Each structure stands twice: as C-alpha cells, then as structure tokens.
Amino acid sequence: MLCPRAAFLVGSFHGVFPGPPASSHWEFWVPSTPVGAYFCPPQPQLTPPNTPKLVSEVEELYKSITALREKLLQAEQSLRNLKDIHMSLEKDVTAMTNSVFIDRQKCMAHRTCYPTILQLAGYQ
C-alpha cells in the first residue's frame, strides 16, 4: 500500500527506479513489496507536551464561564426586581401627585371660606 506522498512516484518511476527515492520523507524500503511500492514511515500522533496543563486551563475556563453565567442570572433577577420597585414607586408618586393636586385645587378653595386655627385662637 502506498502512502499519499509516494503515490506520484509509482506512476512516474514504475519499473525504472528500483530503489527508494533519495529523500528524507522515506526512512526505509521494504524489498518484499512490488517494485515501485514504497512505505512511508508511520506518522506519530502529534500531542503537545503540555496537554495536561491545557486541559486544566480549559476546565478552569469552563468553571469560570459557569460562575459568570450564574452571576449574570443573579444580576438579571436583581434588574427585574429593581424595575418592579421602580414601577411601584412611580405609581406611588403619581398617586401622591394626584392627591396633592386634588387637595390644592378642589379643597383649598373650600378651606378659604373658614377661618384658620390661628385666627380662631386669636393670634391674628
């Protein structure tokens, strides 16, 4: 079986070039194979030497992401609570503004007909 790098050599050198090509890509030649069939050395699995460190860093990142998502949910809940409080305070302010308006516009004219407490007490 040919490796992909040697496939082009089989077609061009088949029967003409009996030995392995002078290249550093092929380390050995198996003579029991047909002429022109060369084996490439097995490619090693490339794993970085600091893989455990990277794995631990990824786990730390996942933990950090989880913690940040929890904080985000808490912040969103706090924001919803603050919006509810804001709405209730706006309703209270509107009700008090309406009460003051009613007191000044409707009741004040009626109160001016009667003497004040100070006038009744004789201080004015």
From Swiss-Prot:
Regions crossing the membrane: none
| Cellular location(s) | Cytoplasm; Nucleus, Nucleolus
**Please, which domain of life does this record's source organism belong to?**
Eukaryota
Q: Which UniProt keywords apply?
A: Coiled coil, Cytoplasm, Nucleus, Transcription, Transcription regulation
- The protein's predominant localisation is cytoplasm
Is Lyase a UniProt keyword of this protein? Answer: no
Task: List the expressing tissues.
Answer: Strongly expressed in brain, kidney and ovary. Moderately expressed in liver, spleen, thymus, prostate, testis, small intestine and colon. Weakly expressed in heart, placenta, lung and leukocytes.
GO cellular component labels: cilium; cytoplasm; nucleolus
Which biological processes are named by the entry's GO terms? cilium movement involved in cell motility
Using the record for this protein, list the coiled-coil segments as residue ranges, or answer none.
54-96
- Describe its assembly: Interacts with MIS18A. Interacts (via its coiled-coil region) with MAFF.
> What protein family is recorded?
Belongs to the tektin family.
Q: According to its UniProt entry, what is the function of this protein?
A: Acts as a coactivator of MAFF transcriptional activity. Inhibits cell growth and colony-forming efficiency.
Please identify the protein, giving its name as recorded. Answer: MaFF-interacting protein
- Provide the taxonomic classification: Eukaryota, Metazoa, Chordata, Craniata, Vertebrata
By which gene is this protein encoded?
MAFIP
